[in-house]
Every structure is written in structure tokens, then in C-alpha cells.
């Protein structure tokens, strides 16, 4: 368990690491050309593309500021692949979404151990939703790119007592 003072940003780092770690030669996502990990992107994108969005964190059970609190942070991955044949492109975008899930499952424990040595923040990761969402249009092209969306819930624990101790130590 970690404190809320360092916890939330580390969850984002861990999930991003799971993806970038597999975007290497012989990685599960070696074919991915663009990984967008911000809410808004003005730059040029090439497909295959993975666009990640972190949704609001909520209490997993009734909010109680006691010693520990279980929280859930959903991460949405929108995966798109272009192909002249829309049916093939749709299958390829679903395959990319499957590989994103595998990348997170394969790497989250190692990434967490490297970023937070000796600490365990993430309890588990669960699948919330898997949906072939439809298509997006690409500026300058008349073609559409099929997109498959995946939402993974990162379930984590915050230790409020540890937060208070860290705050008190910083005041000394």
C-alpha cells in the first residue's frame, strides 16, 4: 500500500509503462506507430494507434477515510488500425485491443515493482468493457479507421495512516 501523496500519478506511470514496454522489437505491440497518452492531441498520428484515457477515480466500496481505502481508476484504450477492407481493419483493431489487454496483464506487476520497490499499490486489474466502438475519420482521407475500445479497471489501495505519517514527517 502507498499513500495518496504519491499514489495516483504512479498508477498512470505503471499503465503507460505496460504499453511502451511492449512497443519494442518482438514486443506484443511492436507494430504500433502512435501511442497517445493525453486527452488531446494536435500532432500527426499514424496507425496502428493506441489512445489511452484515464477516467475519474472512485471508491470501490463505501468511502471511508479509515486506515485504508480501496479505489478504482478506469483506463480506456481506443485501438485503431487502417485497412482498405473495413472488415479486415475491424478484426485488426480488435486484435490490437486484445494485445493491449495482454500487455497490461503481462507487465503491471513488474512495472509496479520497479516504480514502487517494496510496495504494493495495485490490488488487481479487471476488464470493465470491450467494445468494437465504430469508426473515426482521418483528416485528409475519405476512409474510416475502425476503433475498438477497452476499459480496464485498476483496483488499488491507499493507506491514509501512511499519508498522515508522511505529512507529519514533511512538517518536521
Task: Identify the residue ranges that each predicted region occupies.
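Charged, amphipathic alpha-helical segments and their flanking helix caps
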Residues: 1-40, 55-172
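A short glycine-rich, His/Asp/Glu-containing loop-to-beta-strand
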Residues: 48-52
Amino acid at each position: 500500500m502507498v499513500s495518496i501523496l504519491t499514489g495516483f500519478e504512479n498508477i498512470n506511470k505503471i499503465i503507460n509503462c505496460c504499453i511502451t514496454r511492449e512497443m519494442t522489437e518482438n514486443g506484443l505491440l511492436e507494430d504500433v506507430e502512435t501511442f497517445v497518452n493525453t486527452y488531446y492531441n494536435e500532432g500527426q498520428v499514424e496507425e496502428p494507434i493506441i489512445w489511452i484515457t484515464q477516467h475519474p477515480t472512485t471508491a470501490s466500496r463505501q468511502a471511508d477515510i479509515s486506515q485504508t481505502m480501496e479505489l478504482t481508476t478506469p483506463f480506456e484504450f481506443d485501438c485503431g488500425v487502417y485497412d482498405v477492407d473495413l472488415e479486415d481493419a475491424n478484426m485488426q483493431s480488435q486484435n490490437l485491443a486484445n494485445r493491449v489487454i495482454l500487455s497490461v496483464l503481462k507487465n503491471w506487476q513488474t512495472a509496479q515493482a520497479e516504480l514502487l520497490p517494496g510496495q504494493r499499490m495495485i490490488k488487481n486489474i479487471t476488464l470493465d468493457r470491450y467494445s468494437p466502438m465504430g469508426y473515426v475519420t482521418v483528416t485528409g482521407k475519405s476512409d474510416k479507421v475502425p476503433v475498438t475500445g477497452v476499459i480496464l479497471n485498476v483496483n488499488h489501495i491507499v493507506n491514509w495512516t501512511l499519508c498522515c505519517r508522511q505529512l507529519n514527517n514533511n512538517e518536521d
